[in-house]
Amino acid sequence: MAKEVRFSEDARTRMQAGIDKLADAVKTTIGPKGRNVVLEQSYGTPTITNDGVTIAKAVELDDHYENMGAKLVTEAASKTNDVAGDGTTTATVLTQAIVNEGLKNVTAGANPVGIRSGIEKATAAAVAGLNKNSHEVEDSSSIQQIASISAANEEIGKLIADAMEKVGHDGVITIEESKGIETELDVVEGMQFDRGYMSQYFVTDNDKMETNLDNPYLLITDQKIGNIQDILPVLQSVVEQGRSLLIIADDITGEALPTLVLNKLRGTFNVAAVKAPGFGDRRKAQLQDIAILTGATVVTEDLGLQLKDVTIDQLGQANRVTITKDKTTIVEGKGDKTALADRIKSIRQEIDSTTSDFDREKLQERLAKLAGGVAVVRVGAATETELKEKKYRIEDALNATRAAVEEGFVAGGGTAFVNIIPEVKKVADSLQGDVATGARIVLRALEEPLRQIVENAGLEGSVIAQRAKSEKPEVGFNAATGEWVNMIDAGIVDPTKVTRSALQNAASVSAMILTTEAVVAELPKKDAPAAPNAGGMPGMM
């Protein structure tokens, strides 16, 4: 396929057009008075959302150069989402602001490499300022405030605060669709461990890259599975019952894994496989924990058990299993309750008797997994469209809350960025030439989230941003009520991790775009010429 190469200003201008198209769609959603965006689906009803990364991923532009620009902004949003779980719209707004201001200076003759250096120095100063102004999460009310702000819904905030109170800050919280219209919280027995699917072909939900197994059997073994014939008898038994199967094994090698994947893709049976958690003796203990939770027998040579002899009675069962690329969550294992209680009691006794801090920590992790349970938020809504939108909001709120527990929180509504402007200005004033220009670009960009929040509320962003700079620290503009308040006292807060990640990723992607000197793209396909008109056929006798 032939390629086209564009250079310098021409290349950057085309990419900038794509950045603006994507960012203009995403930034309408920021703040308490942000709007929704409707996304067309290849089938079914459109999705309505205000989730920045979902909108960004849905944008595909016809022009190759514009599309590359849009995809680079999507990268900033996605990275922020991966690290902090929220803040994708903020990352997009900051990226657009830095790129647009930076391109003006590059076009005017500034050196992009110097500008990049200034952006990096100013970002480092801004991050230090955010960390200095951060407050620790101390109680359930802080959690509720953060979740409420992220979801723009007080009921959702209360729900997530309740869930965290019941299973702990590090507890497992999953989000499922309810059959009714009410959104409820339920705490069930379950556990999570740090192992993901062995192959992405096991994925059942391509949007979230998750594998969901309803009412599955579980085959648990500390052995390697290298030959599909070893597990064929038990596979056939599972297929006959029309159930799905989760295999937890030391490893699946040789032709066994491709055979499982092929049969999954053909629809012969629904299967997924993950590696066993832990190592050595701890692996054996964790496998036994999972077995007791689900009512399985661990297939191990220590007990003289072979894979080829496994029967369906030795498999575990659960109500639901969710697997991502790095975690597996088992919800409502169907094991014996008495055996589970005995196992928990045994682990507690080991914790009391051990003299090793490391062993105690690992035992406490196992205890939390077994005894803590899983909080299930069942999302209800009147329509499919509302259900999806609500689910996105709850996921964002949960991610934001976890981020706040991890690194604390800062004043929300764009106020945290305005509060660190004096510190970043000190750095900018100490620099020279194009490096100083780069730092001042970040200075101006720090006002942009507040401006956009205010403009989405129908007010003049520049006027509010100017006043915000002269206010006391943590005093900001509440766009929901139109009042100036202490943002911390009013419960308008953002997780430090989300705010920091949004700025760092925006600065990183923007610096790459500004230092781009050539862009290579495929030439647009030319339509084949229409067939010539053959004219009329001669008459027939």
From Swiss-Prot:
Its main location: cytoplasm. It catalyses: ATP + H2O + a folded polypeptide = ADP + phosphate + an unfolded polypeptide. InterPro entries: Chaperonin_Cpn60_CS, Cpn60/GroEL, Cpn60/GroEL/TCP-1, GroEL-like_apical_dom_sf, GROEL-like_equatorial_sf, TCP-1-like_intermed_sf. Gene3D superfamilies: GroEL, GroEL-like equatorial domain, TCP-1-like chaperonin intermediate domain. GO terms for biological process: protein refolding. Coiled coil: none annotated. It comes from the Bacteria. It is found in: Cytoplasm. ATP binds at T29, I30, G31, P32, D86, G87, T88, T89, T90, G413, N478, A479, A480, D494. NCBIfam families: GroEL, PRK00013.1, PRK12849.1, PRK12850.1, PRK12851.1. Forms a cylinder of 14 subunits composed of two heptameric rings stacked back-to-back. Interacts with the co-chaperonin GroES. PANTHER family: 60 KDA HEAT SHOCK PROTEIN, MITOCHONDRIAL. HAMAP family: CH60 (MF_00600). This is Chaperonin GroEL. It comes from Oenococcus oeni (strain ATCC BAA-331 / PSU-1).
